[in-house]
Amino acid sequence: MEDSKPKELRKVRLSRYYRFFLFFIMASIEGVMNIANGLLSSATKEVKKSLNMNDAKFGSFGTSNSFGRIISSTLFGMLNQKISRKWSTTLGIGFHAIFLLCFHITDNANVLIFVRGLHGFTQMPPSIYVPVWIDQYAIRSYRTVQLTTVQLSQTIGKCIGYLLNMYFGLEHWKKGFLVEAGYLLFCTFCCLITSEDYFSMTLYRPKLSDEEEKKLRISCTIYEEQERKVENKKKRNFFSDLKILSCHSLYMLSVASRCILHGINTCLHFWLADFMRNVIHEQNQLKITIYYTIICFAGPVGGMIANTVLKPIIHSYESRKASWPLVLLQITASIFGISIGFMKTTLTTTLATICFLIFNSSALPIVQGILISCVDKELGATGFAIANILTQVLTSGTTPLLYGIINDKYKEIYPNLAMICIMSLEFVAVPFLCALAYLRNKKFDEEEKNKDKGEELVDK
C-alpha cells in the first residue's frame, strides 16, 4: 500500500507534464500552419508575377483558404460527438503537410487556389481543438494567457514566413513550404505516438465539501439544469446543439465580436506587405521584413503584457470585471486600426499597426474565452466550430478578396482606400461588445440573487 501511492503520484505528474508538452506541440502547430500566409503575403509581387495573377485573384488565396475552413468546421461540428479527437487532429496535420508540397508540383494558379482551400480544410481540426482543450484543462488564472500564447504563435508563424523568404530570396518563395511541411510531419509523428487519453475531453467534476454539496442541492435552478443535461445528453447532435447556441444571446454576441476582430486581423496580415510596397512605396524588402518582424512580435507580445497588467483588474475572462474593459480595448483598437490607412511612411504605418495589434490581441482572447465559457462544457467544441464557420464566411473569407477588388478598382485614384474601408469595419464590433457587457453583468446580478436566496434557505 505504501509503494502504490508514490507510483500513483508519479503517474499524475507525468500526465501533467505530458499535457504541457501536448499544449506546446499544438500551439506550435497553430503557428507553423500560418507560415504559408507569411510566405505568400511577403512576396505578393513575385507570387502574382509567377502565377500570372491580379490583386483580386491573389485575394482569392485568402478566400479559398477560408472556405476550406468553413467546410471543415461544419463537418467537425456535425461529427464532433462521433469522431476521435486524436485521429481528426493527427490526420489534419499530416494531410496539411502533404498538400503544402503541391506548390512544388504545379504553377497553375487555379489549382493552387484550390490547394489553399485544402490547407484551410486540414487546418481546422487542431485550430478548433486547442482553445477548447485549454478551457477544459488549463489552470483558471492562466487560461487567458494560454489563449494569448496560441494567438501569438499564429502571428509568429507568419513572421517566420517572412524570414524564410528573406533567407531563400523572394524569387524562391516556394522553398519555405518545405520547411513548414517538414515540421508538421514531425508533429504528426508526435500525435501518433500519443495516447488517446491525452486528447480526451472527458468532463471532471471536482470533489465538493459537505457545505458546498448542500448548497448545490438546495439551489433548484442548478439542480434542474444538471438533470436536463443528463436527460438530453443522448439526444444531442450538431443541429440540436446549433439550435441551443442560436438562442444563447451571450454566445451570439461573442461570435459576432470574434468575427470582426479575427477577420480584420487576418486581412491586415495578408495585405500589409503589399500596402507598404505599393501605397507607402517602400521597395527595400529587408526593411519591410524587419518592420514586419517587429510588428509580429511587438503587437501580440504587447497584447500579452497588457493582459498580464489587466489581470489584477479583470482576473479572468470568466469574471464580470472583464466586460467593460473589453469595450475600451476595442474602441482604442478601432481608432488605431483606421489610422493605418492614413499613414504616409513605413515607420508610422508600423507604429500604428503595432498599437492596433496590442489592443486587438488583448481583446481577442477575452472574447474567445467568453465565447467558450458562456455555454455548457459539452457544447464547447461545437460552439467553437460554429464560431469558426461564421468567422470565415462573414469576415476572414471575404475581407482579403474585398480588399483586392477595391484595390484593383481604385488604386490609381485612392491607393489607400482599400485599407481604410477594411479597417473601419473594426468599429462595428463596439456595439456588440457593449451589448455583451450589459447582458453579462445582468447575468451575474441574477446569479448573485440566486446565491443569496440559497444561503438564506441554508440558514433556515
Question: Could you describe each region identified by the protein language model?
Answer:
Residues 87-101, 321-338:
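Structural signature of the two symmetry-related core transmembrane helices
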Residues 38, 65-74, 124, 158-159, ...:
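Residue-level signature of mid-helix packing/kink "hotspots" within the transmembrane helices
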Residues 175-193, 417-436:
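Symmetry-related core transmembrane helices of the 12-TM Major Facilitator Superfamily/SLC fold
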Residues 40-41, 248-304, 364, 368, ...:
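Extracytoplasmic gate region of multi-pass secondary transporters
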Residues 52, 84, 105-110, 122, ...:
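Helix-breaking motifs and short loop linkers at transmembrane-helix boundaries and internal kinks
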Residues 71-110:
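Conserved MFS/SLC helix-loop-helix module at the cytosolic interface between two early adjacent transmembrane helices
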Residues 1-35, 49:
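Cytosolic juxtamembrane N-terminal segment immediately preceding the first transmembrane helix
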Residues 115-154:
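Cytoplasmic helix-loop-helix junction between adjacent transmembrane helices
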